[in-house]
Curated annotation (Swiss-Prot):
<dbReference type="Pfam" id="PF04770">
    <property type="entry name" value="ZF-HD_dimer"/>
</dbReference>
<feature type="compositionally biased region" description="Pro residues">
    <location>
        <begin position="106"/>
        <end position="125"/>
    </location>
</feature>
<feature type="region of interest" description="Disordered">
    <location>
        <begin position="228"/>
        <end position="257"/>
    </location>
</feature>
<dbReference type="GO" id="GO:0000976">
    <property type="term" value="F:transcription cis-regulatory region binding"/>
</dbReference>
<dbReference type="InterPro" id="IPR006456">
    <property type="entry name" value="ZF_HD_homeobox_Cys/His_dimer"/>
</dbReference>
<feature type="compositionally biased region" description="Low complexity">
    <location>
        <begin position="141"/>
        <end position="155"/>
    </location>
</feature>
<keyword id="KW-0539">Nucleus</keyword>
<feature type="compositionally biased region" description="Low complexity">
    <location>
        <begin position="21"/>
        <end position="35"/>
    </location>
</feature>
<keyword id="KW-0371">Homeobox</keyword>
<dbReference type="InterPro" id="IPR006455">
    <property type="entry name" value="Homeodomain_ZF_HD"/>
</dbReference>
<feature type="DNA-binding region" description="Homeobox">
    <location>
        <begin position="174"/>
        <end position="237"/>
    </location>
</feature>
<comment type="subunit">
    <text>Homo- and heterodimer with other ZFHD proteins.</text>
</comment>
<keyword id="KW-0238">DNA-binding</keyword>
<dbReference type="GO" id="GO:0050793">
    <property type="term" value="P:regulation of developmental process"/>
</dbReference>
<comment type="function">
    <text>Putative transcription factor.</text>
</comment>
<feature type="compositionally biased region" description="Low complexity">
    <location>
        <begin position="242"/>
        <end position="257"/>
    </location>
</feature>
<dbReference type="GO" id="GO:0003700">
    <property type="term" value="F:DNA-binding transcription factor activity"/>
</dbReference>
Length: 257
């Protein structure tokens, strides 16, 4: 690929790059031989670096890998026989660059002798301390209503029973939820508990379900409340024996008929 119009590079004095001054030998071969005779480093020209697309703002080289002088006179000897470019477009290698690179390359660092330190002593593993019984959180205190009277304002949402080991551990970790009732709910539950005799029987299942839906209390919660307040409220009001007069009256009516 050749582009016309690219002349040989000329410096300010009008001398082409790479040409020897008139005072030197007439041919590059003679100069090279003279240099070799004087003991100077051999000068070589490698690949062509001429940019053939400089006018278009690109970068294209012809791919010539080494300068080969044309046979003929001194002017033709400065042109490459492979690419036709001037010798100054080829990369010059006079052997000094390799020497400079050798001087710039730092010497390999001397290996450092590692400092011998004694091995670290193994730390003793801490033994787990036995847990004392007083470190465990105490179980929540459950107030049991006494027979002296007084109504309770709270009721547990779970039935009382013999606490197992797992249940006791669970009680120690979480707080039991307690249902709070309004004064109207307490009055209605008290009246209904006295009506059924503070007991839940099978024949009263439908009545209990209807009452719980009306008051807004779950059946299990009402059952626990009635169990907790039976000894304190039921004994003082005498509600445990209210069914007996009713049963006696029904029997007397049947006998009269």
């Amino acid at each position: 690929m050749e582009f016309r119009g690219h002349d040989e590079p000329v410096d300010e004095m009008g001398v082409a790059y790479g040409r020897t001054p008139p005072s030197s030998s007439s041919s590059p071969a003679a100069s090279a031989s003279a240099g070799n005779g004087a003991g100077a480093a051999e000068v070589r020209y490698h690949e062509c670096l001429r940019n053939h697309a400089a006018a278009m703002g690109g970068h294209v080289v012809d791919g010539c890998g080494e300068f080969m002088p044309m046979p003929g006179d001194a002017a033709d000897a400065l042109k490459c026989a492979a690419c036709g470019c001037h010798r100054s477009f080829h990369r010059k290698d006079d052997g000094q660059q390799q020497q400079q690179l050798r001087l710039l390359i730092p010497s390999p660092p001397t290996p450092r002798v590692p400092l011998l330190m004694p091995p670290p002593q193994p730390q003793p593993h801490p033994h787990p301390h036995p847990q004392h019984p007083y470190l465990h959180p105490p179980f929540p205190y459950h107030h049991t209503p006494s027979g002296s009277g007084g109504t309770t304002t709270e009721s547990s949402s779970e039935e009382r029973g013999p606490p197992s080991s797992s249940a006791a551990a669970a009680q120690g970790r979480r707080k039991r939820f307690r249902t709070k009732f309004t004064p109207e709910q307490k009055e209605q539950m008290l009246a209904f508990a006295e009506r059924v005799g503070w007991r839940m029987q099978k024949q009263d299942e439908a009545l209990v379900e209807q009452f719980c839906a009306q008051v807004g209390v779950r059946r299990q919660v009402f059952k626990v409340w009635m169990h907790n307040n039976k000894s304190s409220i039921g004994s003082s009001s005498g509600g445990g024996s209210r069914r007996q007069p009713q049963e006696q009256q029904s029997q007397q009516q049947q006998q009269q008929q």
